[in-house]
Structures are given as structure tokens and as C-alpha cells.
């Protein structure tokens, strides 16, 4: 019995670690992203985890590929659980021309956070299960997710992407190419002066003077921050007052608050979770290398271990 328990324990940990490590090998890596400073339209492949969600042929929300079969997005994008006409496009560059690097999948399951509240958009996060796995390419890769304990100090520079309006009520022009904007993190204490319904499940980003922000149609898309050599999703586009208004930064669901919930829903093929820790400074670490923060890889989670306990039980008790 002791030997059997030991062997099963080693097997359990080995399988769990190997599965998570496989995801960590690819998440947050964007080979075609050579960006240093901001632009407007993003080159194809710059943000390979960006997902375009379509209902009956029209884009309505963004999302992020977080593993070969799962997309992270916003709960407010899905007031209904209907799967009719719902498609997810990965590797898409624009909404009007052909996209030779894209693939599409239907969505087989929508999992809104059980504690989502449409007022004040608390826990505005959702998971979508795709109909089949997608193959990773330079144009299609998963993003790393901020792990529990991640810290995003004020003025940490991050990027938000999407096909939303370029300003309130003004849709993007033909051919509706994926757009990007660089925005600094705003502390929750400062952000709460603009939004009195702000909670710890939210993170804010934007310029005090306005002019740069996510907008309608960007909902569910990623706010990502570079951590060493990988990109980490810190937030999911949630809400704001208008678009890019002065003193009203964009508000995002804080991804690091949901590591346990995400892991419990997915069970296997877990995303790569990275603990983002930054001093809020930009530039170099003195060696000529960019040093926005440090990376601590999270290889496996307690929920996944518990999900495998029935297997161990059957092996130990029934054999």
C-alpha cells in the first residue's frame, strides 16, 4: 500500500506539472511583436492571443486565447447563455479583408462567473469553451494570466487591444484593423475617486488627461503588461464612462483575483499563470535589458490536485 501510494503521488504531481509546463512554454510569447512605443493599427501577429467574438456574422466583443480550447472574456458580453450563431476567430487581423492566418471555432459552453453583477459590473469575467483545440502558430498563441498575488503598481505601462469604436459612437474605419493603445495603470485609490462602485476585483488603466482608452466593442478583450520576455493579462475590458474621457480611466476585471475559479472551471489544459511583480518603473535594469518586473511561474494549482483525487481513490481502494 505504501509503495502504491508513493507511485500514485509521484505520477499525480508529474502529470500535473507536465501539463502546466506545456502551457508555460508558449503563453505570452509574441514572436512578431517588436513594439517599443505606441501605434494605432497593430501589425498582423502582434497580439496573437486576441480573439474576435461574432454573433450571426458580426463582431460584438473581444476575448483572449488562454489555452488550446479556452477563451477568457467579459461576463457582460453574455447576458444570455445562447450559443446560436456564436463563433470565435483566432489569428484575425481585420474585420473586412481575408485573414490568411486565422481559424474559427464554434463555442460549446459559456461560463459566466457565478457572482457577476451587472451593476456595478463586479466579477465581470467569463470563460468560453471552444468546439475543438486550436493549433498554435506565430499568429495564434495563448496569453499568460496574472496569478494570485500579482502587483500592478500605478504607472505600469500596459496595452489594450480590440476592434471597438475609435471614440464614443464612432466605429473603426474600413478595413477595421485590430487597434492597440498603450495605457498606464491607475491605482485603485485614485480610480475610486472617479467610480464610487469600484471593488478589489477591478483594475484601472488610462491617462489622466484622457485620449487613450478602450471603447464599445473592445469589451472582453485583454489588458496586457510585459513581464520580462512574456506578456501577462492583467485585466479584461469591462466598463468606463464614455471612452477616453479625462479623469475617467477604463475599468477592467482584475484577472489575478480569479486564478482559483479559472482553474476549477477548466480542470485540465490549464492556462499559464505568472505572478507579476513590478516596482512600477520603466526602462532598463542596468544591464541593457528591459526590466518591467520579475516572473514567478505557477506550475500547478490546488484545485487541479483535488480534481484528480477520485482517480487516486479508485487506484488505491479498488485495486
Language-model-detected regions and their locations in the chain:
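Solvent-exposed loop/turn segments at secondary-structure junctions
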Residues: 57-59, 77-78, 94-95, 117-118, ...
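Conserved H-D interstitial segment of serine endopeptidase catalytic domains
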Residues: 29-35, 53-54, 71-74, 79-118, ...
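Protease-domain processing segments flanking chymotrypsin-fold serine proteases, especially trypsin-like
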Residues: 2-72, 87, 92, 273-319
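Extracytoplasmic
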Residues: 46-48, 81-85, 102, 123-125, ...
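Extracellular trypsin-like serine protease catalytic domains
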Residues: 30-37, 50-56, 147, 156-291
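Gly/Ser-enriched beta-turn/beta-hairpin loop segments
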Residues: 41, 97-102, 119-122, 137, ...
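Active-site substrate-binding loop(s) of clan PA
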Residues: 99, 111-117, 133-173
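Conserved active-site neighborhood of the chymotrypsin/trypsin-like protease fold
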Residues: 71-75, 122-147
Amino acid at each position: 500500500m505504501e509503495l502504491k501510494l508513493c507511485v500514485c503521488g509521484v505520477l499525480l504531481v508529474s502529470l500535473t506539472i507536465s501539463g502546466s509546463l506545456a502551457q508555460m512554454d508558449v503563453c505570452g510569447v509574441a514572436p512578431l511583436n517588436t513594439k517599443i512605443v505606441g501605434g494605432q493599427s497593430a501589425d498582423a501577429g502582434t497580439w496573437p492571443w486576441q480573439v474576435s467574438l461574432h454573433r450571426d456574422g458580426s463582431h460584438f466583443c473581444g476575448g483572449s486565447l488562454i489555452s488550446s480550447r479556452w477563451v477568457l472574456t467579459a461576463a457582460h458580453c453574455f447576458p444570455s447563455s445562447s450559443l446560436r450563431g456564436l463563433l470565435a476567430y483566432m489569428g484575425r487581423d481585420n474585420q473586412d479583408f481575408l485573414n490568411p492566418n486565422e481559424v474559427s471555432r464554434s463555442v460549446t459552453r459559456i461560463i459566466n462567473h457565478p457572482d457577476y453583477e451587472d451593476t456595478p459590473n463586479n466579477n465581470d469575467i467569463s470563460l468560453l469553451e471552444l468546439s475543438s483545440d486550436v493549433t498554435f502558430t506565430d499568429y495564434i498563441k495563448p496569453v499568460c494570466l496574472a496569478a494570485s498575488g500579482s502587483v500592478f503598481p500605478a504607472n505600469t505601462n500596459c496595452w489594450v487591444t480590440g476592434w471597438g469604436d475609435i471614440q464614443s459612437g464612432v466605429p473603426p474605419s474600413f478595413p477595421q484593423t485590430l487597434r492597440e493603445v498603450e495605457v498606464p495603470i491607475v491605482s485603485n485609490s485614485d480610480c475610486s475617486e472617479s467610480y464610487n462602485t469600484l471593488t478589489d476585483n477591478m483594475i484601472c488603466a488610462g491617462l489622466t488627461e484622457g485620449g487613450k482608452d478602450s471603447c464599445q466593442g473592445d469589451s472582453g478583450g485583454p489588458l496586457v503588461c510585459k513581464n520580462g520576455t512574456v506578456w501577462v493579462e492583467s485585466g479584461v475590458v469591462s466598463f468606463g464612462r464614455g471612452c477616453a474621457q479625462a479623469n475617467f480611466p477604463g475599468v477592467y476585471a482584475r484577472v489575478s483575483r480569479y486564478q482559483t475559479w479559472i482553474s476549477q472551471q477548466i480542470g485540465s489544459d490549464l492556462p499559464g499563470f505568472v505572478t507579476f511583480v513590478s516596482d512600477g518603473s520603466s526602462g532598463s535594469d542596468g544591464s541593457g535589458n528591459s526590466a518591467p518586473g520579475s516572473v514567478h511561474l505557477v506550475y500547478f494549482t490546488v484545485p487541479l490536485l483535488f480534481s484528480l483525487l477520485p482517480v487516486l481513490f479508485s487506484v488505491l481502494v479498488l485495486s
